[in-house]
């Protein structure tokens, strides 16, 4: 199990600020990369180091498929303990169902942070389909 590293709070804040400033673009700032960068900031490790480096939705899907995952929810569930969204803490990750599209996001002090095609959005925890504990 991955553990939280010293200074993870500051590193998490930096990741959130960086992604808020980046454009919505596959391989730059998307629903997987926000979560993977969060995991890296908190634990010092990427979830799947070879799953980055894509530039399109198809490329992202191929990276997940290489690990036999159909979506980010399956990728997260293979690495982390599933928890009830109401038990999630800052820095934990989760997914929402956005009209059939499974999108990853991060639990923050402001709500559940996700990225759509245009911007970062903070949603209420009640919108989260599944949550995953990132280190402890």
Where are each of the predicted segments found?
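Generic alpha-helical propensity signal that fires on short helical segments
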Residues: 42, 112-114, 130-132
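...with weaker cross-activation on analogous glycine-rich loops/strands in unrelated enzymes
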Residues: 59-120
